[in-house]
Design a protein with these regions (language model features):
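Juxta-kinase regulatory segment immediately upstream of eukaryotic protein kinase catalytic domains
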Residues: 2-33
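ATP-binding pocket architecture of kinase catalytic cores
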Residues: 36-207, 223-226
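Active-site activation/catalytic loop segments of kinase-like enzymes and analogous catalytic loops
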Residues: 243-283, 296-314
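Catalytic-loop of the protein kinase fold
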Residues: 210-212, 217
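All-alpha amphipathic helical-bundle segments outside canonical DNA-binding/catalytic cores
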Residues: 163-164, 285-297
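Helical subdomain adjoining the active site within ATP-dependent kinase catalytic cores
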Residues: 286, 303-344
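Activation of the activation-loop gatekeeper triad in protein kinase-fold domains
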Residues: 232-237
Length: 344
């Protein structure tokens, strides 16, 4: 799996851009990095094409909207740039940002440039690339990162206007329902059942924070000592319910059906231990809503996968892996509905 996603490759033909145009723009707006001499495409990153820039003053990362017809509100690189820039002076590990370009004429779509965070990305959700006795450290760093994010004061860091406060789950159900319907390639019965069931079961939102929206192991860069140094892929970030964000992050234990004994054998925390560590770090209280949050998260990831499949249909997906990922929509929706039926 790591070979499929790790590192860079020659840029796909439909994702190439004019380097001369970029350099002309950078000369006026970001001369400090020098001229860009070459660029490659990162293998990972199915949604927003991401490039490694080889510039005169070092390596940098350019992340852009994909070309073509796009779903409304999708591929929001401007939002990524805003949240990353706001978090730069906090203890949340993020790459430094340099520039946002909203002029489509430069390389064809909006883009931003940030520092290149050199380190290790574990592409397997269980960190199988690491030795067994290192995995709990990796997972604890991951746990610490999301807790730090959820503890940020949105007013203090200037993100109070980054999204609407309250009714986060309701708005998310509406968003992913629209994305699913707009992208539907075949009717998934369990998805339609969840669309009907979820709005009736929404718990009271007790906390409000910045949420990442897609926080998982392969969106984190680690250094050689397995300290988290950069959280990536902020496209879905907004103001919302941190418990929902954390539940989405915990889908690993449900999709993989990882029991306490299995977690011990793998060398990671059980879900209960991992959840308790997060609640200890944040001092949040969780009543009896965890099952709902997990079901909602399965619905959300099904909507994301269906959106990817819709982009394959429309010819705007940026990776061959997108086809495989998109076909998982039914699996996630079916699992969510099976769990929902147990608490009807």
């Amino acid at each position: 799996m790591s070979d499929q996603f790790s590192g860079v490759k020659d840029v796909s033909e439909h994702l190439k851009f004019d380097l001369t145009h970029l350099n002309t723009y950078l000369e006026e707006n970001l001369a400090s990095i020098g001229r860009v001499l070459d660029y490659k495409q990162f293998k990972g990153g199915q949604s927003n094409p991401t490039y490694l820039l080889e510039a005169e003053k070092g390596k940098f990362v350019l992340r852009r909207k994909p070309p073509g017809s796009l779903l409304k509100s999708a591929h929001a690189v401007d939002r990524e740039y805003k949240v990353l820039t706001s978090l730069m002076d906090t203890d949340v590990p993020t790459p430094k940002t340099f520039l946002l370009c909203e002029d489509d004429k430069v390389i064809g779509t909006q883009f931003y440039i940030m520092e290149f965070s050199e380190g290790v990305i574990y592409w397997d959700p269980l960190a199988s690339e690491a030795e067994k006795d290192k995995r709990k450290k990796i997972f604890d760093e991951m746990n610490k990162g999301i807790a730090l994010l959820h503890l940020q004061d949105i007013n203090k860091i200037g993100l109070n206007d980054f999204g609407k406060e309250g009714n986060y789950i309701e708005r998310q159900i509406s968003r992913w329902t629209r994305q699913y319907i707009d992208s539907e390639t075949e009717k998934i019965d369990s998805m339609h059942r969840l669309i009907e069931w979820l709005p009736k079961k929404i718990p009271e939102q007790k906390y409000t924070s910045i949420v990442h929206g897609d926080y998982r192991l392969d969106n984190i860069v680690f250094d050689g000592s397995n300290n988290s140094i950069a959280i990536l892929d902020w496209e879905l970030s907004t103001i919302g319910d941190p418990l929902a964000d954390f539940a989405y992050h915990c889908l690993l234990w449900h999709i993989g059906d990882i029991s306490v004994s299995a977690a011990s054998e793998i060398g990671i925390f059980s879900e209960k231990e991992y959840l308790e560590n997060y609640l200890r770090r944040t001092n949040f209280k969780l009543e009896n809503d965890w099952n709902f949050y997990i079901i909602f998260s399965l619905f959300k990831v099904a909507g994301i996968c269906q959106g990817i499949l819709g982009r394959v249909r429309d010819g705007t997906a940026s990776s061959d892996f997108a086809i495989q990922m998109g076909k998982r929509a039914k699996m996630f929706a079916d699992l969510g509905w099976e769990k929902a039926k147990k608490i009807l």
